Design a protein with these regions (language model features):
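Donor-sugar nucleotide-binding helix/loop cap in glycosyltransferases
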Residues: 514-610
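Extended serine/threonine-enriched, polar tracts that run as long, contiguous segments within proteins
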Residues: 284, 293-300
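ATP-dependent adenylation/nucleotidyltransferase module used to activate substrates
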Residues: 2-286, 290
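Short linker/helix segments within small regulatory modules
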Residues: 303-306, 482-493, 497
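ATP/NTP-dependent adenylation/nucleotidyl-transfer catalytic domains that generate, transfer
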Residues: 1-94, 98, 299, 304-458
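Short microdomains enriched in Cys/His and/or Lys/Arg
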Residues: 331-347, 490-505, 514-519
Length: 610
């Protein structure tokens, strides 16, 4: 990754030989973005998208080497504020577009060295792994980075030695759908096999079943992309365990988490799959220069002002980009907003719905508590000294099928024996009008027993909640799970690796909706959970008993400190005085507070369920 300077001559970028630790991720700015944000009221430019007019770094706009404007804020329904710093052209003269041919020519030497080095990497990985895997494939998303990754790969490898795979989430921008169609035809013309994978559910169905995805409850990528792709490739190219190299357009500068990726890794997404990121160290400057130099397809969404192309409604999307999305695709965005409000259990009367959507309240849910669902958990554990008693809504043989992924199950004359890691437990089941009961011999608090309870809860989650999203099928590294016609089958070849049981809460659907009604019934549960408590607030209050963070945060802080026993009616208690003397730098202070917090509804629920 190279540093760059602004080039007044071309209005573009000029790479230099200095290495840059962190890119500012520059991107070209076309007239459509200027129109959407309202710059057309102040600047004169032709409505021509054959070339950009300027560049942006985050919210700052650069024209021929000068910062001429910036934007602030913006929400789903409110345009960002424009801050005009200086006139791009004197006396209102028309803006001059970036001279792309000259910019490309001036960057040729440095860019070509980077490109050739990347092509060699791809070829060397191919040589090293071609006898170890069933297939090489480029994971294509329709974004600029995957366009570049694909072009690099097709230059490095024979066209019959890799596939292109598009995971259709049914939530893409319309511009992505258009680009994928063009790219598919181009691949066909060049002898490259282009494949598409999709979930057996539409996005409308999945959002209504799982509830809208959130930052901490992101079922969407697995259900709509990763699992369908792995299952499709396994069915098509593998006889048993799939071994493959997935070539991506992932770049380290896209996010903090991606900056920690290794260029080559094994099993990070799915077991049996190597992930190779050939352009991991490329910056967006190099990406755009390569696209322009090769005349590659560019998703029109970038011309509207997006720095990344993903789904129409994403919990990780910024407020500014949500505004642009709604300006570009109003009907689609409003459709997803309706799904969000229809599934929320919050009071969204009056202006509450608009505020909820504008502030991204839907993005912060941690469980099913905030969803409009009306059922208790379908299984519960009541532990006695003699038995682990699992009550279930409906007793079916499905739990015995899933138990085969955990250990051996034997039935003889009504007696059930369960084996886990060479330890056998007696089991019995019964059923009445209220549901079913599975009683398992309690063998104490050994490591084996703790693991047994954890994994058996996953077995019950699958048996009670499975909606056949097929994530478990994809998670099995040996392809020993199959689902068809509403039935789950576990092969006798299952090696009990437990990968399928380690899915969040045992089942993505259960993980998304769990705790819905049970948590709604707990008074005081929402005193501080939806906003969260900053430890610095507590530290500051203990240092200065008059400290308040302001607005709703103050209520949240006092709610937490009331539960912790520090204050009562916003006045310091004797316990609070003790904590003040000890100070929050003493870990014992927090331990004592947690002793009090353990009796509150939120912490009670966490202790018993998590």
């Amino acid at each position: 990754m190279y540093s760059y300077d602004w080039d007044e001559e071309t209005g573009g970028l000029l790479l230099n030989s200095a290495q840059q630790k962190m890119s500012k991720e520059p991107r070209p700015v076309y007239y459509k973005e200027l129109d959407i944000l309202g710059f057309d009221k102040y600047w004169n430019y032709a409505k021509d998208d054959s070339a950009p007019y300027m560049w942006a770094e985050a919210n700052n706009y650069w024209y021929h080497g000068r910062k001429v404007a910036s934007v602030k804020g913006g929400t789903l329904y409110t345009a960002p504020e424009l801050v005009l710093l200086e006139e791009p052209e004197p006396d209102g003269k028309p803006l001059i577009p970036v001279n792309i041919p000259l910019m490309v020519a001036k960057n040729h030497t440095i860019l070509e060295a980077l490109v050739q080095d990347t092509i060699k990497k791809v070829f060397n990985i191919y040589i090293s792994y071609r006898k170890k895997v069933d297939i090489f494939y480029v994971a294509f998303s329709g974004g600029k980075d995957s366009v570049v990754a694909l072009d690099i790969v097709q230059r490095a490898l024979p066209h019959n030695e890799f596939k292109v795979v598009f995971g259709n989430t049914d939530m893409e921008f319309p511009t992505t759908t258009e680009l994928v169609q063009k790219l598919s035809r181009k691949c066909s013309d060049e002898g490259i096999e282009f494949l598409e994978a999709a979930s057996n559910m539409t996005s409308k169905e999945s959002w209504n079943i799982f509830g809208p995805p959130a930052r901490k409850v992101r079922w969407c990528c697995t259900v709509h992309k990763t699992a369908p792709v792995i299952n499709m490739l396994s069915d098509k190219f593998a006889n048993g365990k799939l071994r493959c190299v997935m070539i991506t357009g992932v770049r380290g500068d896209e996010s903090v988490s991606r900056s920690e990726y290794d260029e080559m890794s094994m099993g990070k997404k799915m077991a049996g799959q190597y992930s190779f990121h050939p352009i991991l160290e490329w910056s967006s400057a190099e990406i755009y220069l390569y696209i322009y130099s090769q005349g590659l397809l560019l998703n029109d969404a970038y011309k509207y002002g997006f720095n990344r192309v993903g789904c129409i409604m994403c919990p990780n999307s910024s407020e500014k980009h949500e505004y642009i999305k709604r300006q570009c695709f109003p009907e689609l965005v409003d459709e997803y907003c309706e799904r969000i409000t229809q599934n929320s259990a919050k009071d969204l009367s009056g202006d509450n719905a608009k505020i909820f959507l504008e502030t991204g309240g839907w993005k912060s849910r941690l469980s099913g508590r905030e969803l409009k669902l009306s059922e208790e958990d379908r299984f519960q554990l009541n532990e006695t000294s003699a038995y682990l008693k699992f009550t279930v809504n409906k007793l079916t043989p499905v739990w015995k099928t899933w138990y085969k992924t955990m250990g051996i199950i034997e039935e003889n004359s009504g007696e059930i024996m369960l084996e886990y890691n060479s330890v056998w437990r007696k089991c019995r089941e019964s059923e009445d009008e209220n549901g079913g009961l599975i009683e398992i011999e309690n063998l104490g608090n050994s490591k084996n027993s703790i693991e047994f309870i954890f994994l058996f809860k996953s077995v019950l989650a699958k048996s009670q909640y499975c909606i056949f999203c097929k994530t478990c099928v994809a998670e099995c590294p040996h392809r020993n799970i199959s689902m068809s016609d509403g039935k789950v089958t576990i092969s006798d070849k299952c090696i009990k690796c437990h990968e399928c049981l380690k899915i969040l809460s045992g089942c993505l659907y259960y993980n998304s909706i769990r705790g819905s009604k049970a948590m709604k019934s707990l008074k005081g549960i929402n005193k501080y959970l939806s906003v969260g408590v900053d430890a610095e607030w507590i530290n500051s209050f203990i240092d200065d008993n008059s400290f308040e963070p302001g607005n709703r945060k103050t209520d949240v802080m006092y709610g937490f400190m009331t539960d912790a026993g520090i204050v009562a009616k916003r006045k310091l208690t004797s316990f609070g005085e003790l904590i003040t003397r000890m100070g929050t730098s003493d870990a014992n202070s927090w331990a004592l507070m947690l002793c009090n917090l353990a009796y509150t509804p939120a912490f009670q629920w966490y202790i018993k369920n998590i």
